[in-house]
Design a protein with these regions (language model features):
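Conserved beta-strand signature within the Rossmann-like core of class I S-adenosyl-L-methionine
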Residues: 136-143
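Class I SAM-dependent methyltransferase SAM/SAH-binding core
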Residues: 46, 52-97
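A short acidic, Gly/Pro-enriched loop at the edge of an enzyme's catalytic core
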Residues: 99-108
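Short, glycine-/aromatic-enriched active-site segment of Class I SAM-dependent methyltransferases
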Residues: 144-161
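Conserved class I S-adenosyl-L-methionine
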Residues: 1-41, 147
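Short alpha-helix
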Residues: 162-178
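A short glycine-rich, Lys/Arg-flanked "PGG" loop and its adjoining helix->strand segment in the class I
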Residues: 123-135
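A short SAM/SAH-binding and catalytic strip from SAM-dependent methyltransferases
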Residues: 107-120
Length: 211
């Protein structure tokens, strides 16, 4: 039986190649523009699964916000610290991460970091990220949707086991966690690499209303 790789192993191996293929997904760039329009000056932002730091941390730190990026891949964190010196990066897992900042974040961004988990871990990660959103703040997330449970696949040449939630499961979980969903949509992205086929992407924008 082929040993399945962890997310850290996959992204340590992929490095900047991941950014080359997925670093400028049009809907992700639109999501960043959406959140940037709504943040106050010097906002506190958490980038979950920050990768190389591009485009999320780079764009928001460049706009003057205080950005913290977390990623399970040591190689990605090292690269991000070099490419985006205006943000802070930590090697950390969303399942166990404890923010240093009291009072939460003005924005939590989560672009595709939850797939190499099981469904209960994804649900717990959504709950945790929602809890880090300060009143008046936002959560912007993207993933590959579907009621997927422990599916063994080959992705970018790496054997991994993936899970996900359907669109409705995501929306219900975020609402139960106290967020208001403002917008969501799905789209199809085709990376320019034969090892990465077309992907359905789910984007969701949510907020925690002030009392």
């Amino acid at each position: 039986m082929t040993r399945r790789e962890t997310a850290a192993e996959v992204f340590d191996a992929l490095g900047a190649r991941y950014e080359d293929l997925f670093g400028r997904v049009p809907e992700q760039m639109a999501a960043l523009a959406w959140i940037a329009e709504r943040l106050p000056a010097g906002a506190r932002v958490l980038d979950v699964g920050s990768g190389t730091g591009r485009p999320t941390a780079e764009a928001l730190a460049g706009a003057g916000h205080a950005v913290t990026g977390i990623d399970v891949s040591a190689a990605m964190v090292e690269t991000a610290r070099t490419l985006v010196p205006g943000a802070r990066f930590e090697q950390a897992d969303v399942r166990t991460y404890v923010p240093r900042e009291a009072g939460g974040f003005d924005a939590v961004c989560s672009f595709f970091p939850l797939l190499v988990m099981d469904q209960p871990e994804i649900e717990a990660a959504l709950d945790r990220m929602a809890s880090w959103v300060a009143p008046g703040g936002y959560l912007v997330l993207a993933t590959v949707p579907g009621d997927i449970r422990g599916l063994d696949i080959e992705w970018m040449g790496h054997p991994v086991t993936v899970s996900s939630l359907s669109v409705d499961q995501h929306l219900r979980r975020l609402t139960e966690a106290g967020l208001e969903v403002l917008h969501h949509h799905t789209s199809t992205f085709v990376p320019a690499d034969p090892l990465a086929g077309p992907e359905e992407h789910f984007f969701c924008y949510a907020t925690r209303r002030t009392a």
